[in-house]
From Swiss-Prot:
Belongs to the DEAD box helicase family. DDX48/FAL1 subfamily. Interacts with MAGO1 and Y14B. This is Eukaryotic initiation factor 4A-III homolog B. The lineage of its organism: Eukaryota, Viridiplantae, Streptophyta, Embryophyta, Tracheophyta. The keyword Nucleus applies. It comes from Oryza sativa subsp. japonica. CDD domains: DEADc_EIF4AIII_DDX48, SF2_C_DEAD. GO terms for cellular component: catalytic step 2 spliceosome; cytoplasm; nucleolus. GO terms for biological process: mRNA splicing, via spliceosome; mRNA transport; nuclear-transcribed mRNA catabolic process, nonsense-mediated decay; regulation of translation. It is found in: Nucleus; Cytoplasm. Expressed in leaves, flowers and seeds.
Length: 404
């Protein structure tokens, strides 16, 4: 395993060769960026960004995408999905043509903005123009940018749909549609908006779905707008997040969760921690309660103005804040390297979300710890999660701080 023995581990060197892919016959595994047929100035950007070696999903998915095939790619959180999307799109786009040629839809503003950032960094030497079309930002800015001309739009379904209907986002040159975090996009209320967007796109369209989990009902939906897709799938049993130790703390009643969190606070601040609640109201309540007990925490959820969300994300990314309380808006693919502890103050409402949340705590094979607060009535959900991911969640040991 070359990645394991590399002395200088860039963000792109990963110990994930042991993932088992259930992949369409004939999909090549290409173990270096140089062998992918990528243009020279794009390769410069990839290496400048710090990548050394493609991850397992990049080794398999980039070539089919840049060859024009429809693709369903499944990769667990932290395996380099965003950079795989960015790399493929940068290769496909003709930067001499100042029109939108690729559209990437994401379920959250933060993920759409992150995709824009990574693409601009990787595509620095090809002068790619990318715009994040997301709610909470000025519509005037969207109109100005789109009329000036961009090659790629990375956005959320609502705002993208709005821009298309206003005829500000012209779709005639779009040749590639990518749905990132497709399980969330199609399975949780975004379905209608995606179909709305899809109706405006040219008939000769390449479609790619990328996600950490692909439940059966999602795969059924893909038949409606994909032609003979290449499948690149991780076996579900392999989706346990390697290197992440998972624990639970039994709490008799809801109020005890707060005391447990306070007891753990010193452990949290050893590194950086994310605490997940199921509702925005709970995030606000917990944040206020922690602060009134003199604990330093920051908070983020979907009701906050975009500017405030950006500022909070920036502080957390830079390490200025160490404990972030949030809802599942944060669980979808955001890349903060230092996070090695996740606490599920509330267990997630569905088992697919579990992997998105705890995937946050060990990106690219980094070790991590996930702690679940579990009431008596939650035991069933916890057992269901264990069974679904073929994993074991043990009671939290006293020396949990030593594991982080």
């Amino acid at each position: 395993m070359a990645a394991a023995t590399t002395s200088r581990r860039g963000p792109g060197a990963m110990d994930d060769e042991n993932l088992t892919f259930e992949t369409s016959p004939g999909v090549e595994v290409i173990s270096s960026f140089d062998q992918m047929g990528i243009r020279e100035d794009l390769l410069r950007g990839i290496y400048a960004y710090g990548f050394e070696k493609p991850s397992a999903i990049q080794q398999r998915a980039v070539l089919p995408i840049i060859s024009g095939r429809d693709v369903i790619a499944q990769a667990q959180s932290g395996t380099g999905k965003t950079s795989m999307i960015s790399l493929s799109v940068c290769q496909i786009v003709d930067t001499a043509v100042r029109e939108v040629q690729a559209l990437i839809l994401s379920p959250t503003r933060e993920l759409a903005a992150q995709t824009e950032r990574v693409m601009l960094a990787i595509g620095d030497y090809i002068n790619i123009q990318v715009h994040a079309c997301i709610g909470g930002k000025s519509i005037g800015e969207d109109i100005r940018k789109l009329e000036h001309g961009v090659h790629v739009v990375s956005g959320t379904p609502g705002r993208v749909c709005d821009m298309i209907k206003r005829r500000t986002l012209r779709t005639r040159a779009i040749k590639l549609l990518i749905l990132d975090e497709a399980d969330e996009m199609l399975g949780r209320g975004f379905k209608d908006q995606i179909y709305d967007v899809y109706r405006y796109l040219p008939p000769e369209l390449q479609v790619c779905l990328i996600s950490a989990t692909l439940p059966h009902e999602i795969l059924e939906m893909t038949s409606k707008f994909m032609t003979d897709p290449v499948r690149i799938l991780v076996k579900r049993d392999e989706l346990t997040l390697e290197g992440i130790k998972q624990f639970f703390v039994a709490v008799e009643k809801e109020e005890w969760k707060f005391d447990t969190l306070c007891d753990l606070y010193d452990t949290l601040t050893i590194t950086q921690a994310v605490i997940f609640c199921n509702t925005k109201r709970k995030v606000d309540w917990l944040t206020e309660r922690m602060r009134s007990n003199n604990f330093t925490v920051s908070a983020m959820h979907g009701d906050m103005p975009q500017k405030e969300r950006d500022a909070i994300m920036g502080e957390f990314r830079s390490g200025a804040t160490r404990v972030l309380i949030t809802t599942d808006v944060w669980a979808r693919g955001l890349d903060v390297q230092q996070v090695s502890l996740v606490i599920n103050y509330d267990l997630p409402n569905n088992r697919e979300l579990y992997i998105h949340r705890i995937g946050r705590s060990g990106r690219f094979g980094r070790k991590g710890v996930a702690i679940n607060f579990v009431k008596k009535e939650d035991i069933r959900i916890l057992r269901d999660i264990e069974q679904y991911y073929s994993t074991q969640i043990d009671e939290m040991p006293m020396n949990v701080a030593d594991l982080i």
